[in-house]
Amino acid sequence: MSAVSQPQAAPSPLEKSPSTAILCNTCGNVCKGEVLRVQDKYFHIKCFVCKACGCDLAEGGFFVRQGEYICTLDYQRLYGTRCFSCDQFIEGEVVSALGKTYHPDCFVCAVCRLPFPPGDRVTFNGKECMCQKCSLPVSVGSSAHLSQGLRSCGGCGTEIKNGQALVALDKHWHLGCFKCKSCGKLLNAEYISKDGLPYCEADYHAKFGIRCDSCEKYITGRVLEAGEKHYHPSCALCVRCGQMFAEGEEMYLQGSSIWHPACRQAARTEDRNKETRTSSESIISVPASSTSGSPSRVIYAKLGGEILDYRDLAALPKSKAIYDIDRPDMISYSPYISHSAGDRQSYGEGDQDDRSYKQCRTSSPSSTGSVSLGRYTPTSRSPQHYSRPGSESGRSTPSLSVLSDSKPPPSTYQQAPRHFHVPDTGVKDNIYRKPPIYRQHAARRSDGEDGSLDQDNRKKSSWLMLKGDADTRTNSPDLDTQSLSHSSGTDRDPLQRMAGDSFHSRFPYSKSDPLPGHGKNGLDQRNANLAPCGADPDASWGMREYKIYPYDSLIVTNRIRVKLPKDVDRTRLERHLSPEEFQEVFGMSIEEFDRLALWKRNDLKKKALLF
């Protein structure tokens, strides 16, 4: 590689025939007149320029890299080597030590600031390089021990002769002997020692490292312990106030959450206050009975198309947002008033999807045997009739009133309504617009009841009625036998029955025949479902049927609303897993999972992304 500083005159052979002409290596044209020669190549003066900046290279130095000609400034900028000490580019002789490069004059002892003589021993103590004279006072101990330490390598055990040496772990090492004990990687920068042996950072963490339970990264330096959990000091944050924990400060650990003691106490106080009041934005109160003798109130909330009771709401985590909560002042309630046949028969059929709605009602005592129809508007569809048992005597038999074309008596308030009926409320009074699914307890029938009912009438019936005394109901003069027949041309399927023919005496529901004109309502009872009402959702594992979905379609990956199948229970996504997939995800059977505490189940569900 050479640079031609002065243009050379073209010799006479350049003006020979084209077959012997000399071509420019850059432009490919014939060289005439003054040309430059670089090694065995020829260039026009104007064609010999820097590949990077285009400056003229005829008068200055240049470098050749992969057949390209580059000026000095651009070559140093692109490919040059800097001195570790002065940060200037190195040209000419280079000194390399511990993976770093220096000018010969810049590689000096850190103590006496003198350059190292050629062939002299260099000692590196982990931070600085020292000459042989300055490194002697560093070691502590007898001169014999010092001499032995200087002569033998801590890695190979052989004598360290003239040359560079490295001081680490109170030993001297050949530069090529200071390696990771596990992978054998040469350690020329940071390392971590364990039992007097050096390890690279990756192998040390793989063998002895501790992971942070919050960020799941390895912890180096200070570590905060809470029980069996470990955290970076910056990762251990109170779930309530979001502040870090000071050194020596007490911590309250619950599941995977950590609290300041004061924050935990404040949260408990808030939880107790929340149990005694209902939020107008998140829950609605549905009366168990509208009579003055109603013994209880049942609290529901509408979440993502599902109706949740108070147990389900209490199981929801505080960090999970609740969507689609219907305001209680938007739900229409009407007094229990008897209405004409036209009001009871005018129902419109709209586009509705199947959504379950838990309904529980308690019986109300009454001293009269008369029955009147009332109105209750949770939906605009599926007008189910509920009848309640009699009063103290237990012999008052509720029955379906006979509907006729004659004008009914004036509307009056009744103290003990026993039939619940959906009136013609239209779209404006109904914000749910979903067909309810009525559920009932499956248990024993009371001893005093007669269980004989005609099997054919059971299959035809599509209305739920509180079962009274069978003989009294059959002989009741208020029951019109003509109204028990099915209208011709009406296609209805019977309600699905729970396993077993007996029901709990507290909820002695039975079936009665439909009212006249039932086929005109456009109602479809085929989706009616009988399931336990008000029972513990966990206890109803074997009673309620959960549709099986693959694990991938049930995963909740973040805190925003996730698109899940419509018919899944968002509070119990794990119930929609098959037993085999449940065992694979949680490492236990369903029965073992149900026996765990609630906080433990929620913690496992969070780790499985099903919470």
From Swiss-Prot:
UniProt keyword annotations, A-Z: Cytoplasm, LIM domain, Metal-binding, Phosphoprotein, Repeat, Zinc
List of residues that carry Phosphoserine: 282, 294, 364, 367, 452, 476, 578
Record flagged with keyword Protein transport: no
Domain LIM zinc-binding residues, every copy: 22-81, 81-141, 151-210, 210-270
Compositional bias per record (Basic and acidic residues), positions renumbered to this chain: 269-278
All residue ranges annotated as the HP domain in the record: 543-611
Binding sites annotated in the UniProt record for Zn(2+) 3: 212, 215, 232, 235
GO MF: actin filament binding; metal ion binding
Compartments, record wording: Cytoplasm
Region: Disordered, residue numbers: 269-295, 336-527
Cellular component annotations (GO), alphabetically ordered: actin cytoskeleton; cytoplasm
Tissue and organ distribution: Highly expressed in skeletal muscle.
Biased composition (Low complexity): 279-295, 363-372
BP-aspect Gene Ontology terms: cytoskeleton organization; lamellipodium assembly
Pfam families recorded: AbLIM_anchor, LIM, VHP
Sequence positions that bind Zn(2+) 1: 83, 86, 103, 106
Origin superkingdom: Eukaryota
Residues that bind Zn(2+) 4: 238, 241, 260, 263
Binding site for Zn(2+) 2: 109, 112, 131, 134
UniProt effect for mutating residue 274 to M: In a pancreatic ductal adenocarcinoma sample; somatic mutation
Residues where Phosphothreonine is found: 472
Primary location group: cytoplasm
Compositionally biased region (Polar residues): 393-404, 473-488
Primary role: May act as scaffold protein. May stimulate ABRA activity and ABRA-dependent SRF transcriptional activity.
Subunit (UniProt): Interacts with F-actin and ABRA.
Name the UniProt record assigns to this protein: Actin-binding LIM protein 2
Species name: Homo sapiens (Human)
